[in-house]
Amino acid sequence: MTNLSQSDHSAAPAPVVVWSKPENERSGSPLLVMLHGHMANEEDLMGILDFLPDEFTVASVRAPVAQGQGFTWFPLMQDAAYSVDKVTDAVQDVLDWVDSIKEPHSSVTLLGFSMGMAVASSMLRARPADYAAVVGLSGFVVPTDGSTLFHDSELENQRVPFFWGRDQEDPVIPGDRIEFTHAWLNRHTKLTKVLYAGMYHSINAQELGHVREFLQMVVPGVSRTPLSR
């Protein structure tokens, strides 16, 4: 595992990123960009690497705003400071960074947990043709609220494979947000939705096994080798 802090790009400094492979081993591999949840950091999701197909180069990205003992992508939706512009500002910065590093890779896939799923789905809405697949874990999709960054009608025609795993008893994501997310994903993506009882607002081994199988099925160049543990 190697740490990398990229140099400045366009209008914003590039994020702090943890990579699964050194730079000289990344060329030609599919890229998986991981986006953590609220008040976490770029190391938070690296514990799932052993479950992911070996072909991927994984880049786990730190959110831009320090909060508590971690970082956040944008204010919580129930906070007065929240706006869709705060979401799209964060999303645009990650889009710009991905543009700067994606060239050596065969494809780009996104994986987001909780608020990270909101960022991942927003990136997909901004660039419907850019991603092989998206994985959303215990998360949600944000309402458009008139943002010109999102191209939902174009995305409807793309039908990008999207895995959404969650627990119906998740105590963190409100029910109205889940209802919106479910309807939006059904309309705009090729959705694989799986429920996991007793997981609450987290990730478990069964879900990660399903994520592995999903990625093996939908991302070109990823072999269907079984998980050896």
Show where each model-derived region lies.
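Conserved serine/cysteine hydrolase catalytic core
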Residues: 142-161
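A conserved short beta-strand
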Residues: 129-142
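Gly/Ala-rich beta-loop-alpha elbow adjacent to hydrolase catalytic centers
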Residues: 111-116, 120
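Serine-hydrolase catalytic machinery in alpha/beta-hydrolase-like enzymes
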Residues: 7-105
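Short beta-strand/loop motif that positions the catalytic acidic residue
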Residues: 158, 163-166, 170
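C-terminal catalytic histidine-bearing segment of alpha/beta-hydrolase fold enzymes
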Residues: 176-229
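Active-site signature of alpha/beta-hydrolase-fold catalytic machinery across serine-
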Residues: 47, 122-126
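Acidic catalytic loop of the alpha/beta-hydrolase fold
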Residues: 143, 168-173, 201-202
